[in-house]
């Protein structure tokens, strides 16, 4: 069996470019593989003389004759009588199948068992619904079919499958546009099509493709869906060969695209072309699945139909009355305007979706340049209800990309930056959804944003910026600059004033600025605020840019947003707003004096003297980097200092993060030591501030960290355990082992290392930014290089973006002056060799 399987796989891989071009060819390989397995299953079943007491059925992919290289062989064995005699023979039969290399998943049940299990579990019922008889008798087949016909009513089955699908979707963030999709289970993957067929079979009573093709409702959609299904089967077969898994990893994508022998476009790699084709087909399957579910739901929902001119409303859905649309082009946008102003209507019915999709060709240059349709689109952007879902529907029907042609270029556009987890278009819609949710209701932690977004003069400006902020990707060059021009031209075309169009364009051009500044620069430094204020110029721009930035980052990768990043952005916003409003701004020394006074208020007697002496050791920068709350907490810890031990404090911050304070005698290579200790204590550093006393004898270090071992919020007891672990690692530092952190295999990505050096002549320091792939003990390696080259780290901001990091260090020479260019070159060379 193994040799035949290898032959089928080798032939498939050898002819992959042909199969890729004509996906229906994959069915021969799937069927050949299934048939070979079937021969083995049946031959051995008969050799063990089991047919008198048992029947055997093929389930799942085996039942559909769609066996992939990594598929399990699903068997349903029906025991004819309750007291079977040849149980030992059956056990030896299953064992032999495993010995022959088959991954067997099987059940052994009597007819009564099937009745009980299939009646309770929709998954089991579905497996019998689609099973195929291998060795059986008409009598047993009839009994099984009779049980199935009475087990699940149509509506009950439909609801079960809908709930099952919703749970599955949650595992993939409810989108078919994940960058490394699971080709079996992701939304838009094979399971979506199979689920749609189960609904068609059980709820619509269609037995096969021919019945579906003859139907009035689905005849025009089934062929296209089958073509998409075939393509994704091609991709799954190839992925099973390359990795033996169903997830289409970045590494697999590159290997498979090479084997497909694709010809690249001007600005797109072949892998991008392949993945765009995947997402196009995944979207088609997702839409087909949705069509089937919505069609059944509409057919079983009783609601009065109300007529409103060209439209009708049934329940919470709106439709367009039948007839040609060639002279009713305005209805394409009018229907969305109607939804946007009616709270009780939230979607379009299935026949109308089909009608709109069939008439997308009416969106031509005349339509795009018509002032009336421009006004309609603006009205949609100003909708009171359902905006983000309407724009997503417009995209799914092909309307949005037909109207904004450049948007069509980013549909399915990959993002090989190792921190986005969605395609450009899916990320864009998540940005718009975040904006919409922020506008509708105040969310915990976003009270400021809720207030700001509802005070905007023109909400459509923000939505246009969100829609266009990444539209320049995949076109070659700086996507912000490309998008700025596209967005300005479009905004002008649809009727915005020059000033408003310029604002949209400026937002697109600068949409990365605020996140970059907050994550790389010291926002407690007045120069950082002054420089950013000069870029922004006024509070109107600042408000729009802040709202765009927050919602952009939140839509990038669910795992990357946290309260710390939010606080940095919010502080940058508030400080810049104060600057633009010309509010009185205290000097660095004034801030230090105020904060020191606030701290000293809570102490008295000998404690007051001790803390005053401690605080007197530091200059104004220490107080500017730590607010009064932090200073009070740190001072309280210092009072509990034990002779010969470092002062260590741990506390929760921003719900899921841990703030660490460590006061210790300053020494050469201290940052390197602390980083190693925290790493081996299970903590991942995302921000570090190092303050040294005036005589350089004491170092007060503050770290913001993430607990590496799980994402659950730690309780107080666990926080204390973390503190104890840090102290233990301090005491046993000389015997600590290296980090064993695991990261993904990223061999297919070029080894990147970008080092950027900016000298701050006023502070006599350097801002060193290092961009590279994440790897075990990376921060420790960087700290080691910096230490060996005679530099001292003043602050560090560790920005982990998925599998890529952008680490920014404020460093100075051991002589307390800026680092020379020659030394920076040595550091860069050493980092290149080490990383």
How would you describe each model-predicted region?
Residues 2-3, 13-16, 152-296, 346, ...:
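Conserved nucleotidyltransferase catalytic core and NTase-mimicking acidic/glycine-rich helix/loop elements
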Residues 3-11, 91-192, 196-200, 705:
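Conserved NTP/Mg2+-binding pocket subregion across the NTase superfamily
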Residues 20-33, 175-185, 317-321, 373-379, ...:
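Active-site flanking loop/helix segments enriched in acidic
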Residues 35-57, 199-216, 419-462, 482, ...:
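Alpha-helical phosphate/pyrophosphate-handling elements in metalloenzyme active cores
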Residues 37-87:
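Active-site nucleotide-donor binding segment shared across nucleotidyl transfer reactions
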Residues 65-89, 227, 423, 451-581:
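Divalent metal-dependent catalytic cores for phosphoryl transfer on phosphate-bearing substrates
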Residues 256, 268-317, 389, 531-835:
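Regulatory modules associated with amino-acid/nitrogen control
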């Amino acid at each position: 069996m193994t040799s035949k399987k290898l032959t089928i796989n080798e032939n498939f891989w050898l002819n992959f470019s042909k199969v890729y071009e004509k996906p229906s060819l994959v069915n021969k390989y799937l069927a050949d593989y299934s048939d070979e397995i079937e021969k083995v299953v049946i031959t051995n079943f008969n050799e063990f003389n089991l047919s008198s007491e048992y029947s055997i059925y093929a389930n799942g992919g085996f039942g559909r004759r769609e066996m992939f290289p990594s598929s399990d062989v699903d068997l349903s064995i029906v025991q004819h009588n309750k007291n079977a005699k040849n149980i030992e023979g059956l056990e030896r039969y299953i064992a032999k199948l495993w010995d022959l290399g088959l991954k067997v998943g099987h059940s052994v049940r009597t007819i009564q068992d099937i009745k009980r299990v299939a009646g309770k579990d929709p998954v089991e019922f579905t497996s019998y619904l689609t099973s195929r008889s291998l060795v059986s008798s008409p009598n047993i087949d009839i009994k099984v079919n009779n049980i199935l016909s009475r087990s699940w009513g149509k509506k009950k089955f439909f609801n079960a499958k809908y709930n099952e699908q919703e749970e599955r979707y949650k595992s993939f963030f409810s989108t078919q546009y994940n960058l490394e999709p699971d080709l079996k289970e992701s939304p838009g993957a094979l399971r979506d099509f199979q689920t749609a067929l189960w609904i068609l079979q059980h709820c619509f009573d269609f037995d096969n493709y021919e019945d579906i093709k003859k139907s009035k409702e689905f005849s025009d959609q089934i062929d296209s869906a089958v073509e998409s299904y075939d393509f994704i089967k091609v991709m799954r077969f190839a992925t099973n060969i390359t990795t033996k898994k169903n997830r289409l990893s970045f590494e697999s994508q590159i290997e498979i695209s090479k084997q497909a022998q694709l010809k690249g476009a001007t600005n797109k790699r072949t892998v991008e072309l392949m993945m765009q084709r995947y997402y196009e087909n995944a979207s088609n399957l997702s839409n087909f699945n949705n069509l089937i579910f919505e069609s059944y739901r509409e057919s079983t929902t009783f609601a009065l139909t109300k007529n409103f001119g060209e439209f009708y409303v049934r329940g919470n859905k709106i439709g367009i009355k039948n007839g040609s649309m060639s002279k009713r082009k305005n209805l394409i946008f009018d229907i969305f305007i109607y939804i946007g102003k009616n709270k009780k209507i939230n979607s379009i019915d299935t026949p109308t979706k089909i009608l709109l999709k069939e008439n997308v060709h009416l969106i031509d240059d005349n339509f795009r340049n018509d002032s009336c349709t421009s006004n309609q689109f603006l009205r949609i952007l100003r909708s009171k209800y359902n905006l983000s879902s309407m724009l997503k529907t417009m995209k799914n029907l092909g309307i949005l990309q037909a109207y904004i042609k450049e948007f069509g270029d980013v549909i399915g556009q990959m993002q090989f930056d190792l921190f986005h987890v969605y395609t450009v278009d899916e990320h864009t819609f998540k940005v718009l959804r975040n904006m919409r949710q922020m506008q509708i209701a105040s969310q915990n932690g976003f009270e400021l944003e809720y207030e700001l977004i509802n005070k905007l003069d023109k909400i459509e400006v923000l939505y246009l910026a969100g829609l266009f902020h990444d539209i320049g990707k995949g076109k070659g060059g700086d996507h912000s600059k490309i998008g700025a021009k596209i967005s300005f031209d479009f905004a002008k075309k649809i009727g915005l004033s020059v000033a408003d169009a310029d604002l949209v364009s400026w937002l697109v051009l600068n949409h990365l600025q605020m996140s970059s500044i907050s994550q790389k620069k010291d926002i407690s430094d007045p120069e950082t605020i002054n420089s950013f204020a000069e870029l922004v110029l006024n509070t109107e721009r600042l408000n729009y840019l802040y709202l765009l930035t927050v919602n952009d980052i939140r839509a990038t990768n669910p795992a990357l947003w946290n309260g710390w990043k939010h606080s940095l952005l919010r502080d940058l916003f508030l400080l810049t707003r104060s600057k633009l409003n010309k509010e009185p701004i205290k000097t660095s020394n004034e801030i230090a004096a105020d904060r020191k006074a606030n701290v000293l208020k809570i102490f008295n007697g000998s404690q007051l003297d001790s803390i005053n002496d401690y605080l007197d050791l530091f200059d104004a920068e220490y107080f500017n980097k730590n607010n009064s709350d932090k200073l009070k907490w740190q001072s309280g810890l210092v009072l509990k200092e034990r002779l010969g031990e470092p002062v260590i404090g741990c506390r929760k911050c921003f719900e899921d993060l841990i703030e660490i304070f460590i006061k210790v005698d300053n020494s050469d290579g201290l940052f390197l030591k602390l980083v190693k200790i925290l790493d081996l204590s299970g903590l991942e550093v995302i921000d570090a501030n190092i303050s040294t006393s005036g005589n350089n004898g004491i170092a007060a270090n503050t770290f913001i960290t993430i607990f590496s071992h799980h994402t659950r919020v730690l309780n107080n007891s666990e926080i204390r355990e973390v503190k104890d672990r840090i102290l233990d690692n301090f005491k046993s530092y000389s015997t600590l082992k290296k980090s064993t952190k695991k990261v993904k295999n990223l061999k297919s990505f070029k080894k990147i290392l970008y080092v950027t050096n900016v000298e701050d002549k006023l502070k006599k320091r350097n801002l060193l930014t290092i961009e590279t792939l994440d790897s075990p003990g990376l921060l420790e390696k960087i700290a080691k290089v910096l230490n060996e080259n005679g530099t001292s780290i003043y602050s560090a901001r560790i920005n982990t973006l998925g599998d890529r990091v952008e680490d920014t260090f404020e460093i100075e020479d051991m002589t307390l002056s800026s680092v020379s260019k020659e030394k920076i070159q040595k550091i860069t060379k050493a980092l290149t060799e080490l990383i």
